[in-house]
Swiss-Prot record:
EC identifiers of the protein: 1.11.1.21
Cofactor: binding details: Binds 1 heme b (iron(II)-protoporphyrin IX) group per dimer.
Post-translational modification: Formation of the three residue Trp-Tyr-Met cross-link is important for the catalase, but not the peroxidase activity of the enzyme.
Protein's UniProt name: Catalase-peroxidase
Subunit composition and interactions: Homodimer or homotetramer.
Source organism of this protein record: Xylella fastidiosa (strain M12)
Length: 757
C-alpha cells in the first residue's frame, strides 16, 4: 500500500560523533568515487555478522521444533489483541497476511533476488519502505513467539508461517507450508531496488515518468504524462514494482491517477515479473483483499519518520502517529480507508460479490487518497473498532482493474461463479508467492510440505538407478578423453550447464541437465551449434555405458559435469600438475514437460564475463555485470578472479573470441592471464570511443600483443582485483592457481546439489 509521509530516504538529523578521527564520520571511498566497482558485494553475510556461528545448522535445529505447538501459539495470537496495537475486528489475521505477502512479494524473477527467504523485512530499506508501514508492529507482535522458540524457527520462516496460520484461523484451507528459510543478519546490498532518491518516485525506472507521489490534490503534469504513456511505458529490468518503496503497484492507479484500466497494465507487468500469470494474479488480489482493511484515518502529516530515521526511544518502531490515539480507528498506513468485505475475518466470496454487485464512483479517503465507493449502497461493512458502526462498501483502483480489464474480468467472473476453484487457485498462488525463492523441493522442511510436485519448482526426477563408482568414473573419463572433444568444448559446456545457478532463488544449475532442453539449448551464450555436437558425443558415451548389464546408470547431467572436470584435469596436466577434480554423481535428467520455458527464459545471461560475453549493447559496464553474476554464483572475489584467469586460458570464451586470452598455450591451465595482464611492457588503449574492447601493444615497438574487454582489464585496473591478480601472477603461484581454480570450479559445479548438504 502507498504511504505518503516520507519524501526521500534520508534520516531526519545528522549523527554527530563526539570523538575525532573515528570511522563514524569522515569521507569514505564511496563519497570520492561513487561509481567504484562493488567488489564488496561478493563478501556479504559473512560469519562475522552471524551470532549463531558457522557450525549452526538450521535444518537440523528446525527438526527439533514442536511445530504443532508453534501453530497453536500463532492461532492464539491472532485474537489476542494488545492495547499498544489493537487488532482490527479483534483479529490480527489481515495484518499478518500483509506482513507475509510483503515479505515474499519483493521477489522478482529477473534476477531471483528479493523474496521471503532471508528475513530481510527486518532490515533497511525494506523495514522502512512506505509500503511496509505498520509491519514493524506486526513483527513486534510476533516477538514473544520468536522469543519462546528461539533458533528453532527463523524470522524468515516465522513471518511466512504467521501469514499461513492467519489464513487458516479465518477459515481458509492453505496448500501447505515449507520451512527452511535461513535468516541473514544484515541488509542485502546486492539487490537493485531502483535509482530514485524519492520515496514513491518512478522517474528513473520509467524514464522521467514520476518524481514521487506525496498526497497530491490535483494531477501533476508528470502524472498526466504517465497516464498518456501508460500503454507504452517500459519498466526497467529487473524491477518488479512501479515506484520506489512499493511492493507491486500504486493502489490508487499509475502514479496516483485513478484509472482502473491503466492500473491493470501495471498489475499485469509487475505480477508477471514475479512469475505470476493472470489467473494467479486475480486469485492473489481477490483472495488477499477478502481479509482485513487498509488504513487512512487522517492526512499523512500526522505521521512521523520511518523506523530507520526514528529516535532511540522508539526502539526500532517507526511512523509514530499523532492523530487521535495513533492506533485502532485512528491508524494511518497507506492513506487509503477500505474494508473490502462484510466478513473481513472470514474467508468468503464477498470480494467478487461487491466487485460485480455495485457500480463505483470516485471518492477520497480521510487522508485524501483516491478510492471508490459503491453507488446507492447500504452501509453493510463493519467498523474495525466500533461494532455499532457500519460503513459503505469501498474498493481500490487496483481492485476495479479486475473488473474493467477484459482478461481479468473473465477470470474474476469465473471465480465469482465457482468459489471452490477460486479457493484452490488462491491457495496455490499463495503457496507459490511465499515459496518462490526457496529453490527445489529438497530444501523444504516440516510436516506440511505438500506432496504435489509443481512445475514452477523446476522438478527433477529422483535417482532411480545405481550410481557410478570410482572404477566407473575412471572408465568414463577414458571414454571422454578418447571422444575427440577438445578441452575448450568440455569446459565451456560444463560451465554453461552449471553457471545458470542463482544463489538468490536457488534456481538453475547442472542438476536436471536442462542445458539439453529448451530454452537453454538455444541461448546464444551457449553456442547452440557447438553445443549440439558436444551433447551428441556425450550421449553416445552415456548410451554405451548405460547399455551394460545391471542397474548402474549415469545421467547426461552428470556426464556433462564429469566431462568438464576431464577437461580441467587435462589442462592442469599440461603444466605438470596432476589434480583430481571433485565429482559427486547423483544428478538426473529432467524432461521437457518438467521445464517451464517461459520461467527459465529470465535465467539467460545478458552478460557472462566468465565467458567474455555480452548480448547486445552494454548499457551497464560489463565489469559491473561480472560482479552481479559472480554474486549470484555465491563466489568470493578470489574465486571469481581465479575462475576468470582459468577460463580464459582454457578457451571458454563464447564464439572463440581471443579477447582476454593472454596466452600462447591455449588449453593449458597456466597462470598466463595474470602474468601477461600485469606485464608493464604492455600498453593498453581502447579501440573505439565506446571503450568496450582494448588493444595491448608492446610499449616499445607498438606491436599488437593482445586484445581484452573491460572484464579482462578490470583485474589490472581495480585496486582490489589487481591485488588478487598479483597473487596469481607471482613466479611461485602456478600450483596455487591450479588448485584454487579446481576448488572454485568444483564449487560452481555443485552449487545446486542441495541433496548433499
Amino acid at each position: 500500500m502507498r504511504d505518503m509521509r516520507a519524501s526521500s530516504p534520508e534520516t531526519t538529523s545528522a549523527v554527530k560523533c563526539p570523538f575525532n578521527k573515528t570511522a563514524v564520520e569522515g569521507t569514505h571511498n564511496k563519497d570520492w568515487w561513487p561509481n567504484q566497482l562493488r567488489v564488496d558485494l561478493l563478501h556479504q553475510h559473512s560469519n562475522k555478522s552471524n551470532p549463531l556461528g558457522e557450525t549452526f545448522d538450521y535444518a537440523k535445529v528446525f527438526q527439533k521444533l514442536d511445530y504443532a505447538a508453534l501453530k497453536r501459539d500463532l492461532h492464539a495470537l491472532m485474537t489476542d489483541s494488545q492495547d499498544w496495537w489493537p487488532a482490527d475486528f479483534g483479529h490480527y489475521g489481515g495484518l499478518f497476511i500483509r506482513m507475509a505477502w510483503h515479505s515474499a512479494g519483493t521477489y522478482r524473477i529477473g534476477d531471483g533476488r528479493g523474496g521471503a527467504g532471508r528475513g530481510q523485512q527486518r532490515f533497511a530499506p525494506l523495514n522502512s519502505w512506505p509500503d511496509n508501514v505498520s509491519l514493524d508492529k506486526a513483527r513486534r507482535l510476533l516477538w514473544p513467539i520468536k522469543k519462546k522458540y528461539g533458533q528453532q524457527i527463523s524470522w524468515a520462516d516465522l513471518i511466512v508461517l504467521a501469514g499461513n496460520v492467519a489464513l487458516e484461523s479465518m477459515g481458509f484451507k492453505t496448500f501447505g507450508f515449507a520451512g527452511g528459510r535461513v535468516d541473514t543478519w544484515e541488509p542485502d546490498q546486492d539487490v537493485y531496488w531502483g535509482r530514485e532518491m524519492t520515496w514513491l518516485g518512478g522517474d528513473v525506472r520509467y524514464g522521467a515518468v514520476s518524481e514521487g507521489v506525496h498526497h497530491p490534490d490535483e494531477h501533476s503534469g508528470a502524472k498526466e504524462k504517465a497516464s498518456k504513456n501508460s500503454d507504452s511505458r517500459v519498466l526497467e529490468n529487473p524491477l518488479a514494482a512501479v515506484q520506489m518503496g512499493l511492493i507491486y503497484v500504486n493502489p490508487e492507479g499509475p502514479d496516483g491517477r485513478p484509472d482502473p484500466l491503466a492500473s491493470a497494465r501495471d498489475i499485469r507487468e509487475t505480477f508477471a515479473r514475479m512469475a505470476m500469470n493472470d489467473e494467479e494474479t486475480v486469485a492473489l488480489i481477490a483472495g488477499g483483499h477478502t481479509f482485513g482493511k487498509t488504513h487512512g484515518a487522517a492526512p499523512a502529516d500526522n505521521v512521523g519518520p520511518e523506523p530507520e530515521a526514528g529516535e532511540l526511544e522508539q526502539q526500532g518502531l517507526g511512523w509514530h502517529n499523532r492523530f487521535g490515539s495513533g492506533k485502532a480507528g485512528d491508524t494511518i498506513t497507506s492513506g487509503l480507508e477500505v474494508t473490502w468485505t462484510k466478513t473481513p475475518t472470514q474467508w468468503s466470496n464477498d470480494f467478487f460479490e461487491h466487485l460485480f454487485g455495485y457500480e463505483w464512483e470516485l471518492t477520497k479517503s480521510p487522508a485524501g487518497a483516491y478510492q471508490w465507493v459503491a453507488k446507492d449502497a447500504a452501509a453493510t461493512i463493519p467498523h474495525a473498532h466500533d461494532p455499532s458502526k457500519k460503513l459503505l462498501p469501498m474498493m481500490l483502483t487496483s481492485d476495479l482493474a479486475l473488473r474493467f480489464d477484459p482478461v481479468y474480468e473473465k477470470i474474476s467472473r469465473h471465480f465469482h461463479a465457482h468459489p471452490d476453484q477460486f479457493a484452490d487457485a488462491f491457495a496455490r498462488a499463495w503457496f507459490k508467492l511465499t515459496h518462490r525463492d526457496m529453490g527445489p523441493r529438497v530444501r523444504y522442511l516440516g510436516p506440511e510440505v505438500p506432496a504435489e510436485e509443481l512445475i514452477w519448482q523446476d522438478p527433477v526426477p529422483k535417482v532411480s538407478h545405481v550410481l557410478v563408482d570410482a572404477q566407473d568414473l575412471l572408465a568414463l573419463k577414458h571414454k571422454i578423453s578418447a571422444s575427440g572433444l577438445g578441452i575448450s568444448q568440455l569446459v565451456s559446456t560444463a560451465w554453461a550447464s552449471a553457471s545458470t545457478f542463482r544463489g538468490s532463488d536457488k534456481r538453475g544449475g547442472a542438476n536436471g541437465g536442462r542445458l539439453c532442453l529448451a530454452p537453454q539449448n538455444q541461448w546464444e551464450v551457449n553456442q547452440p551449434q557447438q553445443l549440439s555436437v558436444v551433447l551428441e558425443t556425450l550421449r553416445r558415451v552415456q548410451t554405451e555405458f548405460n547399455a551394460q548389464a545391471g542397474d548402474k546408470r549415469i545421467s547426461l547431467a552428470d556426464l556433462i559435469v564429469l566431462a568438464g572436470g576431464v577437461g580441467v584435469e587435462q589442462a592442469a596436466k599440461r603444466v605438470g600438475i596432476v589434480v583430481e577434480v571433485p565429482f559427486v554423481p547423483g544428478r538426473t535428467d529432467a524432461l521437457q514437460e518438467q521445464t517451464d520455458v517461459s520461467s527459465f527464459a529470465p535465467l539467460e545471461p545478458f552478460a557472462d564475463g566468465f565467458r567474455n560475453y555480452v548480448k547486445g549493447d552494454e548499457v551497464v559496464p560489463s565489469e559491473h555485470l561480472l560482479i552481479d553474476r559472480a554474486q549470484l554464483l555465491t563466489l568470493t572475489a578470489p574465486e571469481m578472479t581465479v575462475l576468470i584467469g582459468g577460463l580464459r586460458v582454457l578457451g571458454a570464451n563464447v564464439g572463440g573470441v581471443k579477447h582476454g586470452v593472454f596466452t600462447d598455450r591455449l588449453g593449458t591451465l597456466s597462470n598466463d592471464f595474470f602474468i601477461n595482464l600485469l606485464d608493464m611492457g604492455t600498453e593498453w588503449a581502447p579501440v573505439s570511443k565506446e571503450r568496450h574492447v582494448f588493444e595491448g601493444r608492446d610499449r616499445r615497438t607498438g606491436v599488437l600483443k593482445w586484445t581484452g574487454t573491460r572484464v579482462d582489464l578490470v583485474f589490472g585496473s581495480n585496486a582490489l582485483l589487481r591485488a588478487l591478480a598479483e597473487v596469481y601472477a607471482a613466479v611461485d603461484a602456478q600450483e596455487k592457481f591450479v588448485r584454487d581454480f579446481v576448488a572454485a570450479w568444483s564449487k560452481v559445479m555443485h552449487l545446486d546439489r542441495f541433496d548433499l548438504v
